[in-house]
Regions:
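Short catalytic/metal-binding and nucleic-acid-binding patches
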Residues: 1-190
Length: 190
């Protein structure tokens, strides 16, 4: 079984002060491009994901030399830098000074930050130890936009892998996990 050969992890990470950064396509693209880079160069195997306005969820495994924590660290570091640059260089960003002040204030007095802190700290990958737990997490990730009242069906949300699990092509490449027969029809609602 696929589950015997891979270690699956889940992680959720949010912007500092839950700032709604991902309401503009330019910022969503920075995040998506960064995930793609990690898929191509860091061994990130993405199984489920969802990007909300101020946080992201990933269910993933890895291949190659980088650990789950290494991949997450690099993804967060790269997206932080690129998203701050995108905000600074966006002439039509009406919230620019407000957002940059929040990220600058959060970055002050932090040893591991030079200027800004974009993501909240202390979010570590959690190992998903069984198929049941893995699919509970995947269902949770996919239902995030439904629970938030953004869409009525999970697969209608663009920045999620829910559509991939229904046989449609999503924004990012996803390695779909097959739900074991024993879990068929067991969708967890939140």
């Amino acid at each position: 079984s696929f589950f015997l050969n891979a270690r699956f992890s889940s992680v959720s990470f949010a912007t500092v002060s839950w700032v709604d950064v991902f309401t503009r396509p330019v910022y969503n693209e920075v995040f998506i491009d960064s995930v793609r880079y990690c898929q191509l160069n860091k061994g990130l195997c993405l199984h489920a994901w969802c990007l909300m306005s101020n946080h992201a969820h990933l269910v993933f495994s890895r291949s190659g030399q980088y650990s789950h924590s290494d991949i997450l660290r690099d993804l967060k570091k790269f997206t932080s830098k690129k998203l701050i640059e995108a905000i600074e260089n966006n002439p039509s960003e009406s919230r620019k000074e407000w957002m940059l002040n929040i990220f600058r204030n959060a970055g002050q007095n932090k040893i591991n930050n030079k200027d800004f802190q974009f993501w909240q700290q202390d979010n570590h990958p959690i190992e998903l130890f069984s198929p049941s737990v893995t699919f509970q997490k995947i269902d949770y990730v996919h239902n995030n936009p439904v629970v938030a009242g953004i869409v009525s069906e999970a697969d209608h949300y663009l920045h999620s892998s829910a559509r991939d699990y229904l046989g449609n092509k999503g924004v990012l490449d996803v390695e779909i996990l097959e739900r074991p027969m024993s879990l068929e029809g067991h969708v967890i609602s939140y």
